């Protein structure tokens, strides 16, 4: 009986996480269908008048939405795509900006689905709580920190793109994004 009980407890936690992600996706769909994303996109399109400002806004929005990395990708992508298209930021660059802020921000934010998952794996040996261990580990998350720094560095630098990203950005600036 104890094996069955243990399996149910473990599966219950995974089911809750799956339900959480599904509900976040549904929330994004409702916001999009209700016109919330389009309204924000229209407002932002009037305020953001350059590729640099559109990229920076994408990075900042990506850092503000730290509850879940999937929610971050759904929301930032839906909201910022029309703004970055208008300002001739390539879809490849938009995808990079979203991806490079989604998980890195979630893994260093104490209030996120990632934090809940990491904290649940920490053994309860009495030396410190899972939250204390998580908070102490934040400065050691160099990938996450450097990824976020790199996003803003690439947004600010005029010639920051290289390789295929530079080619995609050049194509977007010369041909626009009207065919996407």
What are these regions (language model features)?
Residues 6, 26, 39, 82, ...:
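Alpha-helical scaffold segments in soluble metabolic enzymes
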Residues 62-81, 93-159:
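Alpha-helical transmembrane segments and, especially, the helix-loop junctions at the ends
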Residues 147-180:
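Long, contiguous bundles of hydrophobic transmembrane helices that form the permeation core
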Residues 7, 122-123, 134-135, 168-174:
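Generic hydrophobic, helix-prone segments enriched in Leu/Val/Ile
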Residues 8-11, 48, 102, 139, ...:
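Generic secondary-structure transition motif, activating predominantly at the C-termini of alpha-helices
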Residues 1-14, 128-137, 178-180:
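Interfacial loop/helix-cap signal at membrane boundaries in integral membrane proteins
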Residues 1-95:
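Membrane-embedded alpha-helical segments and adjacent helix-loop junctions characteristic
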Residues 1, 33, 37, 71, ...:
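Transmembrane helix-loop junctions in multipass membrane proteins, especially transporters and channels
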